């Protein structure tokens, strides 16, 4: 079996050790000869990289390992780029969340004005990675799971339409893991699903078992009472903010009980509730900086200090196994059915053909073949048209350096009550993002 060379772009991410451990756990299915890391923050990456070097030496000494801030070094001789970058890191995420909240609007990483701000920072970073990949390893594929995936995917469609980039998100996978637990199934792969929408903005229209039996009634019954909170599940290890999001799905479901919703729809359908239950001084970004950031860097420090991973609490990122499934589908033409963010092109019959939609695809060595979804109901279509307009205007604003279009994008967001509030938020975001955004005129 061929052995592959992997580059993790965003090597300094706190998700990197979990992803590397997950890759090592799947070597029988996806053999690896080399793992590289790339980041533009040398100091941050070195802390993670030194610990990962020890993990690899212990668990898979045959795999060549390196990390670099030099694009040529990092991107040469690569088969797959796994991209998870956060331009501006968590201090900028904190502003994405707190600036809208100051104006009484949802402050969230990928939804509403915060997601638009993050998108404006991310476009240049992701396009840069694609260009490095195409220059130094022109046959490589990029598996991009950088947020905000919807805006990033639209930017890749507009700016690098022929690139070998697959945009994927783990949120539906996380919810499907919960669905499988609710149903008492071994794995989410025991379900056959049909899902449609935009990224962080979609609905399951059917869930069946492998024998074709309809599982929707049982799921709907559970979600209508408990949301996606799992009975006897590992809920105590889920942060409070996530538990609330999973529970709130029951109210989102009530709007259309024929489908099952993505949890992120709460930000668009219940923005008043979200703002009311937000702490304007301590947001999700603070939770992450005080939690996962300190934990992962602390554990990496211990590994380096002891020159051993013994007693180390870093664990495999199980959810991230979808990245291996995707890489295997390309490498070995497995024809696996996966949710990807792809150009609609008629898959959703009554929706913009150029929209980047999140739908099931059959993935093989030539990339994804989207499955036909058919027609979608007016309610979902209307919501998606409003949201895809936000995403398209944001990308146009970045390309054209247009203040007008970004103001329109924020105004169009279902989370924002008026054009005046949109303008006030935009002006504050411009001030905060001077280092990262193009100049808007």
Curated annotation (Swiss-Prot):
Pfam families for the chain: Glyco_hydro_4 (PF02056), Glyco_hydro_4C (PF11975)
GO biological process: maltose catabolic process
Binding site for Mn(2+): 169, 200
Keywords assigned: Carbohydrate metabolism, Cobalt, Glycosidase, Hydrolase, Iron, Manganese, Metal-binding, NAD, Nickel
UniProt EC number: 3.2.1.122
Site positions per UniProt: Increases basicity of active site Tyr: 109
Comment on activity versus temperature: Optimum temperature is 40 degrees Celsius.
Keyword NAD included in the entry's annotation: yes
InterPro entries assigned to the protein according to its UniProt record, in alphabetical order: GlycHydrolase_4_CS, Glyco_hydro_4, Glyco_hydro_4_C, Lactate_DH/Glyco_Ohase_4_C, NAD(P)-bd_dom_sf
pH profile of the protein: Optimum pH is 7.0-7.5.
Record's catalysed reaction(s): alpha-maltose 6'-phosphate + H2O = D-glucose 6-phosphate + D-glucose
Inducing or repressing factors: By the five sucrose isomers and other alpha-glucosides (but not by sucrose or glucose).
GO molecular function: maltose-6'-phosphate glucosidase activity; metal ion binding; oxidoreductase activity, acting on the CH-OH group of donors, NAD or NADP as acceptor
Record pathway: Glycan degradation; maltose degradation
Cofactor(s) essential for the protein: NAD(+); Mn(2+); Fe(2+); Co(2+)
Positions of NAD(+) binding: 4-70
Active site location: 170 (proton donor), 264 (proton acceptor)
Binding site for substrate: 93, 147, 284
Note accompanying the cofactor annotation: Divalent metal ion. Manganese, iron, cobalt and nickel ions enhance activity whereas magnesium, zinc, calcium and strontium do not.
Subunit structure: Homotetramer.
Family the UniProt entry places it in: Belongs to the glycosyl hydrolase 4 family.
The protein's role, per its UniProt record: Hydrolyzes a wide variety of 6-phospho-alpha-D-glucosides including maltose-6'P, trehalose-6P and the 6'-phosphorylated derivatives of the five linkage-isomeric alpha-D-glucosyl-D-fructoses: trehalulose-6'P, turanose-6'P, maltulose-6'P, leucrose-6'P, and palatinose-6'P. However, sucrose-6P is not a substrate for MalH, and this enzyme also fails to hydrolyze beta-O-linked phosphorylated disaccharides such as cellobiose-6'P and gentobiose-6'P.
Protein name: Maltose-6'-phosphate glucosidase
């Amino acid at each position: 079996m061929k052995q592959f060379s992997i580059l993790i772009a965003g090597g300094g991410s706190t998700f990197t050790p979990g992803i590397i451990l997950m890759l090592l756990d799947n070597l029988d299915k996806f053999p690896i000869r080399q793992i590289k890391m790339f980041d533009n923050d040398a100091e941050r990456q070195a802390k993670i990289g030194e610990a990962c070097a020890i993990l690899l030496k212990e668990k898979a000494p045959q795999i060549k390992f390196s990390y670099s801030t030099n694009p040529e070094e990092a991107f040469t001789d690569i088969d797959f780029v796994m991209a998870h970058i956060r331009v501006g890191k968590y201090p900028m995420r904190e502003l994405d969340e707190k600036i809208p909240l100051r104006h009484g609007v949802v402050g969230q990483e990928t939804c509403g004005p915060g997601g638009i701000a993050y998108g404006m920072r991310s476009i240049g970073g992701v396009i840069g990675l694609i260009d490095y990949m195409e220059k130094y390893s022109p046959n490589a594929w990029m598996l991009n799971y950088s947020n905000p995936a919807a805006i990033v995917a639209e930017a890749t469609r507009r700016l690098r339409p022929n690139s070998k980039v697959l945009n994927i998100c783990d949120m539906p996978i996380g919810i499907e893991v919960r669905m499988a637990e609710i149903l008492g199934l071994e794995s989410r792969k025991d379900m056959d699903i049909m899902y449609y929408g935009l990224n962080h903005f979609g609905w399951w229209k059917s869930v069946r078992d492998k024998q074709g039996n309809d599982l929707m009634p049982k799921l709907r019954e559970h979600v209508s009472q408990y949301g996606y909170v799992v009975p006897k599940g590992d809920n105590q290890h889920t942060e409070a903010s996530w538990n609330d999001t999973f529970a709130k799905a029951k109210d989102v479901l009530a709007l259309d009980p024929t489908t099952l919703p993505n949890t992120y729809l709460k930000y668009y359908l219940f923005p008043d509730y979200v703002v009311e239950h937000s702490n304007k001084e301590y947001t999700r970004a603070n939770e992450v900086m005080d939690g996962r950031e300190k934990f992962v860097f602390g554990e990496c420090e211990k590994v380096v200090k002891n020159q051993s991973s013994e007693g180390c609490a870093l664990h495999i990122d199980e959810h991230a196994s979808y990245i291996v499934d995707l890489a295997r589908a390309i490498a070995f033409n497995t024809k696996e059915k996966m949710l990807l963010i792809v150009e609609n092109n008629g898959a959703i019959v009554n929706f913009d053909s150029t929209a980047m939609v999140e739908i099931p695809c059959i993935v093989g060595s030539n990339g994804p073949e989207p499955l036909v979804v058919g027609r979608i109901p007016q309610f979902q279509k209307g919501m998606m048209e409003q949201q895809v307009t936000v995403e398209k205007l944001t990308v146009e604003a970045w390309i054209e350096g247009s203040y007008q279009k970004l103001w329109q994008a924020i105004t169009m967001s279902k989370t924002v009550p008026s054009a005046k509030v949109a303008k006030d938020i935009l002006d504050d975001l411009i001030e905060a993002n001077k280092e990262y955004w193009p100049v808007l005129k």
